[in-house]
Every structure is written in structure tokens, then in C-alpha cells.
Design a protein with these regions (language model features):
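A Zn2+-metalloprotease active-site environment signal
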Residues: 1-171
Length: 171
């Protein structure tokens, strides 16, 4: 698997619609400084591979097109009922829906990554430690209600990963 560098400082991993996997320059710099291990980067790559293998990027593009159509129709309707605010309300509803769909995709990609990490012999610990580090780096704890976030809260993701591990190992 070829890992590409996306030249931006924020710490992130990305999957492109064509299947390429990226980590940001900021992420790579954390690795170079010894703040992140190669096993933790492997967990991010496995997660992004999950997005590709499960068709999340393509699905998100389709969802986005549909969401724009619904947002426009809902905005037009609500603008007639609530002049001046209808478009704004429709936009909020659309964003909430997209955040929910994105969180579902994140859980699925986490599960895919966990299975890959376990199968490779690395186990789930690098995945869990990476989430904890990302949580500290991004300082997102408690900044937004979970229903507004595009990614599930770290504690929920870690608990989900532990459940997957228990399911695979029967414990």
C-alpha cells in the first residue's frame, strides 16, 4: 500500500475517491518526532482502507448530491413558512443528517480497521492509543455535542473497538 502525504499541518488521515490513502504532513511530522508509532499509523491506514473498501467515499458523494436536493426543496418550503430563516433551518437539518451518516461510516471503518489490525497480529492497542493521542492533539473533548460531530466521541469509538475485539476473541 502506498501512503501519500497531504501537505497540510492539521493531523488527519484521508481516503481519496480513487482509493489513495493520505496522511497529512502534520501527522507525518508527529511520527518523525516519535510522538506516533508506525503501528499507530498502521491503524489509521487500516481505518482509511475501511472507508475505501466499504465504499464510503462514493456513498458520501451520492449522499451529498441528494442532501443538496433535499436541502434546496426543504429550504424553499421553509422559506415560505418562515421567511428569512427557512434556508438556514434547512441547512442545519442537512448538516445534522450528514453528521449522523458520517458517524456511522466512522464506526464501520473502525470495525474494518480493528479486524485488519487483529488479523495482522498488531491487535487493537495501537488503534486505541492512536485515538487517545488524537483526542489530546485535537482537544475535542466536550467541545461539541456528539450529535453535531462528524466523528463519534473517542470513548465510544474505543468501547466499540473493544467489543469487536471481544467478539473476535470470544471474550
Amino acid at each position: 500500500i502506498r501512503l501519500n502525504i497531504f501537505e497540510t499541518e492539521p493531523i488527519n488521515g484521508l481516503a481519496a475517491p480513487d482509493g489513495r490513502i493520505f496522511i497529512t504532513r502534520g501527522f507525518y511530522n508527529k511520527y518523525q518526532n516519535g510522538d506516533i508509532t508506525v503501528e499507530e499509523i498502521s491503524s489509521v491506514v487500516a481505518h482509511e482502507l475501511g472507508h475505501v473498501a466499504l465504499g464510503h467515499i462514493r456513498r458520501r458523494m451520492i449522499d451529498f448530491s441528494g442532501q443538496n436536493a433535499v436541502r434546496a426543496a426543504l429550504g424553499a418550503l421553509l422559506s415560505r413558512l418562515i421567511p428569512g430563516l427557512g434556508g438556514f433551518i434547512a441547512s442545519i437539518i442537512g448538516n445534522l443528517l450528514m453528521a449522523r451518516l458520517s458517524r456511522r461510516d466512522e464506526y464501520e471503518a473502525d470495525e474494518y480497521a480493528s479486524a485488519l489490525m487483529i488479523k495482522s497480529g498488531l491487535g487493537i492497542e495501537p488503534q486505541i492509543s492512536m485515538f487517545k493521542k488524537l483526542d489530546k492533539i485535537s482537544n475535542l473533548q466536550g467541545s461539541l455535542p456528539a450529535w453535531l460531530m462528524s466523528h463519534p466521541p473517542t470513548k465510544e469509538r474505543i468501547n466499540s473497538i473493544k467489543k469487536i475485539n471481544a467478539k473476535i476473541y470470544g471474550g
